[in-house]
């Protein structure tokens, strides 16, 4: 990297220069030459430096890993992120609460409904409202379907990375079945924007639950097929056992969560330890590993797929009748037929859309158990319709921070499997 590139410049928002253009401020100190500290390591002896990414199929996004190698052994790893930065948190400060929901789709786009639910849980705590029982159960269904989607994509793409093709096809076929269910409910497959503060975008249509039951009858058979092909497969075991080991203490010290933490033997699950949406009333197990390696992360996520099926079956059995949205004119729009026929409802609709609901002054943090770990949203309200601060706690970002420790001492070919086992989405990391 040249000094010219290192001493890059940024556009300042502080003012304009004499020529009417934004003032440029150097990012580096005056006189700085070469790469900033830690960007490119000083090589020792005959060590070699290589890049994986930011454009590489096995990084599953614009992630760059700078690796220092001694032969084929990784001596050091420096992850580079930020290529996909969009400024979600800053944008949220200029949007009403319901207007922020579409941005949550685009963080971890494999868990869009889960992000939607997590966001409105935090907003509803800020507003001090209680949702209906039907909405509560539907949100559990939405979150577990998103967990299944995310784990299926992880499993299928990890199989591709390691060299197994058939399970990839099985996983993506089942993923397509779930997307059809979400599309029938929200009208969208990937970026659903399915929730609203105080409820959902819509109730499930007639016959939708029958489709979910049909999926739950067939999905376990696919899991059995994948289990038979992978779990005791000598090649799969040889490519995953003993790689990227994290002890329980290391996992906790790095702040890992989700399957990454549970694979190391720590039974922490937000659904059990800090229940929300009535998860404490559902009968399901939290799978825990013992070795903290790539193989245990596979086992934990695979078993979580079966546990999600259990939760969904229980949710369907207890899904009550009744409204999906709360009856609160501060938050919920009037019915469409009233908004187009009654002047009062039309005015109510206009003011709520244009001005937005206003929570009381305060702050709150709400975590959920996303497919990748503890996903949290922090809000600060000054009593206006837009949050003063909206902070995202992205599990992918925290989990990725441990990759230098996990790949150290392993072969270059093992880096791909270790990176895949973290299960990252760059939209969530860079935000």
Language model segments and positions:
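Metal/cofactor-centered catalytic core regions of large enzymes
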Residues: 2-431
